[in-house]
Regions:
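Short hydrophobic beta-strand motif reused across regulatory alpha/beta modules
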Residues: 90, 585, 594-595, 615, ...
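Feature of Fe-S/electron-transfer and energy-metabolism proteins
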Residues: 1-578, 588, 599-600, 606-607, ...
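C-type cytochrome heme c attachment motif
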Residues: 581-588, 611-618
Length: 630
């Protein structure tokens, strides 16, 4: 194959756009192929639609380059739509129809009535508060979002590079490569206000500029952190599965900006679909000449590699992550030096997370002011959140920075189910904090949350109702943090263990008011002396619950009787008729209280269960039932 030139790149774009236009002349049937919908049986739906349409003489195109004619259909495996709770999802364009909870048994009717007849099947539409919605964009869950990073997820085939090109893919990279200097790229990213989406919120442009200035160093690296370890978080996974080329393009632009020629994507081994789609994206970009040596004759070379993590939460920390890529044990190190000075193999390294890189192409294409016009003055752009817990609509949400918790939980999430009252929301995963009803109207941005003792973190949002004991919530997160501690520094290794023991004593109604002072003292010590950011923020869930929900602790240490824990208890059961045996509940259970065999109904050991609700939030089938006992 001849080497790709700049004019050849333009020709590829023109061809892709023409194929996309031809595709719009026929029905496009999109089956959500995100992990959640696949676990619900989406691939069975896809395969049945494909084979049945073909057997009935309906031409089926499965990629843009396939011929199907106007009488045929384009059947796509799309990226995650975000509304995992109602999967498997099937979208039909241009009829603008979204079907929810689609089963194989529904496919014949979809083919007969909708694909051939153009009719809407009312029973398959999503319904909320008695209202059925045909159009996806009319559903409150989608209507109240502002999608930038997730704009094309759910609307295109992640494994078809031609679609990404047709939607403007890699034009930002071409612009950066041929019309901008490294300094100009870094300035554009800095002026946009883009801050790291992995938790810290450090300005991305400043980080890139720090690496660019190491002009004496010929070897530099771009590293993408896809090690999403927070319980219930799946934002980065959905982007990697649904729009992998946007991540590659962001990394390539960072390479042009800083002079780096090698990139690494560090992905959790538990994300096999993300790894597969990233690998396909890398192979296809390399095949046409967008990755490799002397790209488009520019003299710039860039290669991207995938490194699979072993599932250690601590490897989400920068220095532990780079150590893991190097083949060492993933453990944080003392800083300085920072990764921008001595990162991967001791070389200057840009380390950003998946969502940060996915934002970059849009900024280069549309300009810094476009991006800065979204969000707040100090926190520009949008943020994706994984909305889970005691909320009607769970799933993946993208909103402008500064959106309030009330808008996310009640307007997008649909509020609290079963007529219960809102009690708390935990934001930021194990490094975040718990907020109360009085905080619902605070803007969700880096600075506002910091003042409240919480952080955005990677973007996990766990909603809790009035039947939640906040001491149990604190214990859940401390159990997770203590279990995931790398053990290198004493404050984190021993301090979190002592805090967990204290919390367990309190929950057993064997504690005293002195234990609350002990928790506060331990928290101060760990926060001030732990080696890395994970240890330094490990106590936030405990301290935020102590600050905002102290009465829950007093019930345990003064009354020695918690009306929630010891009054009306909940026994969790898995409904055998709804359980598909996907194992998500077991993977998310911090107490290993759930067991079972793949594709068979799982069971919960209520002696071990701490009623944290992690399984309830993780189950895509609504198979977890909470039975209240007096």
């Amino acid at each position: 194959m001849s080497k790709l030139t700049r004019s050849g790149f333009h020709a590829l774009h023109t061809q892709a756009a023409e194929l996309m236009e031809q595709s719009r002349g026929r029905l496009n049937v999109l089956v959500c192929a995100g992990t959640g919908c696949i676990a619900s049986g989406a691939m069975k739906v896809y395969d049945y639609l494909r084979t049945t349409c073909q057997s009935r003489g309906i031409p089926v195109a499965v990629c843009l380059k396939d011929e199907a004619g106007k009488e045929g259909i384009h059947l796509k495996k799309s990226g995650c739509h975000g509304f995992c709770e109602i999967g498997p999802l099937v979208c039909i364009e241009p009829l603008d129809i979204l079907y929810a909870h689609v089963k194989v048994e529904d496919c014949d009717e979809i083919i007969e009535k909708t694909i051939l007849g153009g009719e809407v099947i009312e029973r398959l539409l999503y319904t909320q508060n008695g209202v059925s919605y045909q159009r996806r964009d009319d559903i409150p869950f989608y209507k109240n979002q502002h999608r930038v990073v997730l704009k094309n997820s759910g609307k295109s085939d992640a494994e078809d590079m031609t679609e990404y090109l047709a939607l403007g893919g890699y034009t930002a990279f071409e612009k950066a490569l041929f019309t901008m200097t490294g300094e100009e790229i870094c300035r554009e990213i800095a002026n946009s206000g883009l801050r790291g989406r992995g938790g810290g919120g450090f300005p991305a442009g400043r980080k890139w500029e720090s690496v660019r200035r190491h002009t004496e160093e010929p070897v530099k690296y771009i590293v993408c952190n896809g090690d999403e370890g927070d319980p219930g978080a799946f934002m980065d996974r959905s982007i990697m599965e649904g729009n992998p080329h946007s991540i590659l393009e962001g990394m390539m632009i960072a390479g042009v900006a800083t002079g780096a020629t090698e990139g690494y994507i560090y992905v959790r081994a538990e994300y096999p679909l993300a790894v597969k789609r990233l690998q396909i994206a890398i192979e296809k970009a390399t095949e046409i000449g967008l990755l490799g040596d002397d790209i488009m004759g520019s003299g710039f070379s860039f290669h991207i590699h995938i490194n699979r993590g072993a599932g250690a939460f601590v490897c989400g920390e920068g220095s532990a992550l780079t150590a893991s890529i190097e083949g060492k044990r993933g453990m944080p190190r003392v800083k300085p030096p920072r990764t921008v000075d001595q990162g991967l193999w001791g070389k200057p390294t840009v380390l950003n997370n998946v969502e940060t890189f996915a934002n970059v192409p849009g900024i280069i294409n549309h300009g810094a002011q476009w991006y800065k016009g979204i969000g707040t003055e100090s926190s520009a752009g949008t943020k994706t959140f994984a909305l889970t817990g005691n909320v009607v609509n769970t799933g993946l949400v993208e909103v402008p920075m500064g959106t309030t918790l009330r808008e996310i939980i009640f307007d997008i999430g649909g509020g609290i189910p079963n007529g219960k009252k809102f009690k708390a929301v935990q934001i930021g995963g194990p490094s975040g904090g718990c907020l109360t009803e009085e905080h619902l109207d605070y803007p969700m941005d880096f600075d506002s949350l910091k003042k409240l003792g919480a952080i955005i973190g990677s973007g996990g949002l766990v909603v809790m109702d009035e039947d939640t004991c906040m001491v149990e919530v604190a214990r859940f997160f401390m159990h997770f943090t203590q279990k995931e501690s790398c053990g290198k520094c004493t404050p984190c290794r021993e301090g979190t263990k002592r805090m967990l023991e204290t919390l367990e004593r309190i929950i057993a109604n064997e504690g005293s008011p002195d234990d609350l002072e002990l928790l506060e003292a331990l928290s101060d010590t760990i926060t001030d002396t732990a080696l890395c950011g994970l240890g330094q923020t490990a106590c936030k869930p405990v301290m935020s619950t102590l600050r905002h929900f102290r009465q829950d602790y007093l019930h345990h240490v003064v009354d020695h009787h918690c009306p929630i824990c010891n009054g009306r208890r909940r026994r969790l059961e898995i409904k055998a008729d709804l359980c598909k045996g996907c194992g998500k509940c077991a993977k998310n259970c911090p107490m290993e209280a759930i067991s079972g065999q793949p594709r068979m109904p799982y069971t919960i050991d209520n002696e071990k269960c701490i009623h944290c609700g992690a399984c309830w939030g993780a189950c895509p089938f609504g198979a977890i039932d909470a039975i209240e006992e007096e």
